Swiss-Prot record:
One of its GO terms (molecular function) is cargo receptor ligand activity. GO terms for biological process: aggrephagy; autophagosome assembly; cellular response to nitrogen starvation; cellular response to potassium ion starvation; cytoplasm to vacuole targeting by the Cvt pathway; mitophagy; piecemeal microautophagy of the nucleus. Conjugated with ATG12. This is Autophagy protein 5. The gene is ATG5. It comes from the Eukaryota.
């Protein structure tokens, strides 16, 4: 268990250096460039919107408009691609750095601080494909709990395990995400995911990026399907147009390129994310547009 615990600890403690730059349309004219951006370190195992209040507090002095709500109407973008708030930060990063990857190779040189640059935008109407954020922090928490209910149902055939948590444990579970308490979080999560006699299915999501959007698939992953139940067999079944012989695409989990021969059950056990799902990002070492049909 030592290696397993170390891998889990590393994924939980993984951080990203993020630069948030205001859309020029939101900025008071004449503001110096350094005042329209802020830098922060964000846990890979979190949601981007959890950090919106901090970002807006840092930048409110250069905004044309008053910040009436630290959540509603605000959204992140990267090179004209919507960055969804409702996926783990690390998964978004792993998926989106597949855009024009050759141009980004220089960012990963030794002794270089890699910064993920995002644009902060505002619009009254929700972007196509986005989940409207109208309920602030409570909506984020409710959404996260719903993900765990889904994951629990997939594993057990019901949501009894998570619904049976005491009120204090249920509150503590979310607080662990905010306060970064891995030990207590894992203890509660294991009570939800553990199943005697094996799982009914595995909660898995596959994230595939094009130059226009982030596409997410949620396949039904039952033990014993595709022969031995390997990652490669799943990807060839779900994305046959992408994973033919000689494909340059690579599956990445928590920033780690994983072997197609890996057993899905093992990957879930090691790399289940903070929302109860195993998130697989499809990345490419060369620039290309992934088919969407």
């Amino acid at each position: 268990m030592g290696v397993v615990n170390e891998l889990r600890q590393r994924t939980w403690s993984g951080m990203l250096n993020v630069e948030v730059v205001l859309n020029p349309k939101l900025v008071v004219q004449g503001m110096p460039d350094e005042q329209v951006r802020c830098h922060l370190r964000i846990p890979r195992e979190s949601y981007l919107v959890l950090h919106l209040p901090f970002v807006l507090n840092k930048l409110r002095g250069v905004l044309r408009q008053e910040v009436k709500d630290a959540f509603h109407g605000w959204w992140f973008g990267m090179e004209d691609v919507l960055v969804h708030w409702n996926h783990p930060v690390g998964t978004l990063y792993d998926s989106l750095v597949g855009l024009r990857p050759q141009e980004r190779a220089a960012q990963f040189q030794a002794n270089t601080l890699t910064m993920w640059t995002l644009t902060l935008n505002y619009s009254e109407d929700a972007r196509d494909g986005s989940v409207p954020l109208v309920g602030g922090m409570q909506q984020v928490e409710d959404f996260w709990r719903h993900q765990w209910k889904q994951a629990c149902y997939i594993i057990h055939g019901s949501s009894k395990q998570i619904m049976s948590l005491s009120i204090p444990d249920s509150k503590t579970f979310w607080d662990c995400v905010l306060q970064r308490d891995e030990r207590v979080f894992r203890g509660i999560a294991s009570r939800i995911t553990a199943r005697k006699g094996g799982v009914k299915a595995l909660p898995v999501r596959i994230h595939q990026t094009t130059l226009r959007e982030l596409r997410t698939l949620q396949p039904t992953v039952k033990p014993g399907e595709w022969g031995g139940g390997t990652l490669g067999e799943l990807l060839r079944a779900e994305l046959p147009e992408c994973f033919k012989n000689g494909s340059v695409l690579r599956p990445v989990v928590h920033g780690i390129e994983v072997s197609p021969e890996s057993q899905l059950a093992d990957l879930y056990h090691l790399f289940c994310s903070f929302d109860g799902f195993l998130h697989i990002s499809i990345c490419s070492p060369v620039a290309l547009i992934i088919p969407t049909t």
